[in-house]
Amino acid sequence: MDDFGINEMLDMQKALQEKYKDKWKPICPDRGKDQLLWMIGEIGEVIDIVKKHGGEKASQEAPLREHLIEELADVLMYYNDILLCYGITAEELKQSYIDKFEKNMSRW
């Protein structure tokens, strides 16, 4: 897995949602807010690791680094759920990202 892109992550999230469709609420715009809140909770867990141990230690020490990466993966899973909730495709996200990048590159 040399390159891990948005389409692959979206496909994995769709598979996860399908597996638990009888236990979880369906993916739809109304669920987007809940997924945003869950994602913020996961971001808080990332912040706790860095705040408690410092960025250098969190990025260098193996067990702590693994925990940091796991929490960042949780953030990405919720992020991809949010994209699914609002029907945002990888192509739309890519174009918006490029547009924002170009805007930021020309700011100063």
Regions found by a protein language model. Name each.
Residues 1-108:
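Flexible "arm" and connector segments at domain edges
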